[in-house]
Each structure stands twice: as structure tokens, then as C-alpha cells.
């Protein structure tokens, strides 16, 4: 199926991505004491599952560029989405003198500790790729809302993303779909799974004589090896398997799943869709090892970074009683031509220049939200003069 690039409509979005605790290098020295902030530079901490895998390294690249443009020091902690490491990372970054922290947590429960740590240390906090569920985690959501230091969350519409991806497979004729998750209970994973199931249920209702099945998930963690083993298990369990959805986890599980399908000699028999663009996605769309993918959202943490930066500067204030919910769009590609357009403005170059990053840092909260919502291939091309 040939699809043009498009964004998820994000107007009514509601819900919902290991190196121990060593700080990975970013802008500045990454020192572990509070002396760094005495230099006069703003210091922002980044708690991330990995700053070195496919998606994490893209996030780090745009954050480092923003830090350079704004003369900000950044310190990274890779926490592998292990709950105790997620909560400890916030404590570590606060102790290191960070005035603000952006975090990609694994589950809502971790945010209880993260919010308390930031309240106690008077450190501003914003989420990226995540949002606390007002419905499923009402107490934690209220704690975030009550906090004078929790700003809000930048996140994607994961159920819509999941439904879009499974529809790519269904429209290609796939009916036996294997599912690979990464961490049980991860809010983003649960949102995508909801979308996959909704897409299959809708298809089956409309096509009672041509029904599709979606397997129970195999869990891969966030490693390539995990993705490979999960794909092998699904292929062994269903000889008629004709599609796989490695749901996410930073890109490494997807690479492992692709390798397993290639080893089995089933590249032409099993279509694969996923989230988080691979660096060689164009080639994989060309050779058939990928059928489609959502991604291009590595600027999501950039918006969280700008929120925290402005809070530290005093430009954004009075957070108590508020929860800034910032929807961020996905891009979808399902052909080599789709990817070429993405590659030109998001891979060969960053979608924002240093001058544009400085201008972004001066936006009001509402204008920053609008900037996030409109990011697309067309938007990047227009700003590049094309």
C-alpha cells in the first residue's frame, strides 16, 4: 500500500519509551556536583532509557544542538526503563545541580517519586514521550497538577498510532499478525496495544469473512536480542504468521526482529511495521524488510526541554494547579519515496536551525504548543525555503 506522509491529528489526545546510573556525556562537563550551575549556565538533566540506541541518539542530537544554541549545560542519565533506576536518576540529576529535568519514565508510578524529588529540591520537571494518565493514575496526576515544579508532558497519541500501523498491514493483506511488546505495564506500550487491537476489531467487524488475528504479545525488553527471541517464538508458534509488529522500545528490538525474520528466510513472507525510524529505513522499505513505520518524533523531548528552560528563566511560571498537556505528531512512511522526503529534512539535517531554536526558546507556552503540533515534513521544508 502506498501512503503519503501525514501527521496524527492530536486535538483530543489523552493518554499515552543500560547503562546503570552513569551519566552519559552531553553538552558541558556532566560533573556530579552542584558546582556546574555556579558557572552561570543553566543546567538541565535528561533521564532517558538510552541515549545511544536509535531513537535515543536522535533525541540526544537535537537536545545537544538546542543546548549549544542556548548555552545550556546538559547531563544525561541512561536508566533502561528499570523502575528503581528511573527514580534514582531524578535524585542523581537533582544532586548534580540540575535546575530542571526532563524525563522519559516507564510507568506512571515512578512519577510519584520523581515529582517529590523535584519538589524537595526546587527543580522543574517535564515528561517527554509520556503523560500521566488522569484516568488510570488519578492520584499521581493530581500530585503533578498540585506541584509548583511539575510543568507538564509532551506525548503522542499512541492508540491512534497503533491503529494506523495495524491498518497498513491489514490493507496489505496480512491476517496473522504477531505482536512484540517491550516492558509490561509501560504506558506508551499499552496505548499502542490498545490501537492495534482496535484496528483488528474494527477490520473484523467490517470484514466478517476475512478476519485477522493479533497474537498475545511476546516481550523483548529494549534489546536487539530480546526482539530476535520474541520474533523467533512468534514464528515458531504460528507457521502462517504473515506480519510482525515490534511495538517499540527504542529501535533495538525492531532490529533484532528483522534479523530473525531474515535468518528464517521469510523477509518476503512477513511484513513488519513498527515505531521509531531506523537509520536504514529507506533501504528496508526498498528491499521489503519493512512495510511501514511511524516515527520522526525525536523532537518531542526538545519541546519538554524548552518548557523546562523557560521555567528556569522565569518566563513560564505559576505551575501549581495546572498540567500542561502538549500533543506531538507522528510521521508515517510506507514507501521509499515517503522516506526520501523525511530523510532530506530530518536525517541529512535537523528540522530546526540554531536560529530557529533560539526563536523557539522565546515563545509563549501556547505558541510552543502550536509549534509542536505543526511539525511535519511540509513544515520543515517550508522553513528550509523549499
Residue ranges and their predicted role:
Residues 1-12:
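Bacterial N-terminal signal peptides that target proteins for export
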Residues 2-4, 17, 24-386:
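A residue-level marker of the well-folded mature domains of exported/periplasmic proteins
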Residues 8, 22-23:
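N-terminal regions of proteins, emphasizing targeting and processing segments when present
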Residues 12-20:
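Bacterial N-terminal signal peptides
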Amino acid at each position: 500500500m502506498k501512503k503519503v506522509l501525514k501527521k496524527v491529528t492530536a486535538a483530543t489526545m489523552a493518554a499515552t519509551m543500560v547503562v546503570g546510573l552513569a551519566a552519559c556525556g552531553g553538552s558541558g562537563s556532566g560533573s556530579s556536583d552542584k558546582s556546574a550551575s555556579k558557572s552561570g549556565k543553566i543546567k538541565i538533566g535528561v533521564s532517558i532509557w538510552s541515549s545511544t540506541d536509535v531513537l535515543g541518539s536522535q533525541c540526544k542530537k537535537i537536545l545537544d544542538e538546542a543546548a549549544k544554541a542556548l548555552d545550556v549545560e546538559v547531563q544525561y542519565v541512561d536508566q533502561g526503563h528499570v523502575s528503581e533506576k528511573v527514580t534514582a536518576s531524578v535524585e542523581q540529576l537533582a544532586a548534580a545541580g540540575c535546575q530542571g529535568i526532563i524525563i522519559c519514565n516507564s510507568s506512571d508510578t515512578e512519577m510519584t517519586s520523581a515529582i517529590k524529588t523535584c519538589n524537595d529540591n526546587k527543580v522543574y520537571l517535564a515528561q517527554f514521550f509520556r503523560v500521566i494518565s488522569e484516568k488510570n493514575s488519578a492520584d499521581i496526576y493530581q500530585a503533578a497538577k498540585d506541584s509548583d515544579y511539575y510543568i507538564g508532558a509532551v506525548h503522542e497519541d499512541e492508540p491512534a498510532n497503533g491503529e494506523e500501523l495495524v491498518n497498513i498491514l491489514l490493507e496489505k493483506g496480512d491476517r496473522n499478525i504477531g505482536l512484540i511488546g517491550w516492558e509490561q505495564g509501560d504506558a506508551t506500550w499499552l496505548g499502542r496495544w490498545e490501537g492495534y487491537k482496535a484496528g483488528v476489531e474494527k477490520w473484523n467487524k467490517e470484514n466478517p469473512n476475512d478476519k485477522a488475528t493479533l497474537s498475545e504479545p511476546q516481550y523483548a525488553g529494549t534489546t536487539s536480542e530480546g526482539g530476535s527471541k520474541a520474533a523467533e517464538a512468534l514464528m515458531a508458534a504460528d507457521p502462517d504468521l504473515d506480519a510482525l509488529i515490534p511495538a517499540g522500545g527504542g529501535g533495538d528490538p525492531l532490529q533484532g526482529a528483522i534479523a530473525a525474520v531474515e535468518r528464517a528466510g521469510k523477509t518476503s513472507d512477513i511484513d513488519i511495521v513498527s515505531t521509531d525510524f531506523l537509520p536504514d529505513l529507506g533501504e528496508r522499505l526498498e528491499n521489503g524488510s519493512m512495510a511501514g513505520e511511524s516515527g520522526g518524533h525525536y523532537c518531542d523531548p526538545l519541546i519538554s526541554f524548552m518548557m523546562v528552560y523557560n521555567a528556569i528563566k522565569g518566563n513560564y511560571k505559576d505551575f501549581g494547579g495546572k498540567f500542561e498537556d502538549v500533543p506531538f505528531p507522528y510521521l508515517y512512511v510506507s514507501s521509499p519515496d515517503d522516506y526520501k522526503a523525511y530523510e532530506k529534512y530530518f536525517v541529512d539535517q535537523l528540522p530546526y536551525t540554531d536560529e530557529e531554536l533560539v526563536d523557539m526558546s522565546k515563545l509563549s507556552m501556547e505558541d510552543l504548543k502550536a509549534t509542536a503540533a505543526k511539525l511535519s515534513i511540509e513544515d520543515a521544508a517550508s522553513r528550509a525555503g523549499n
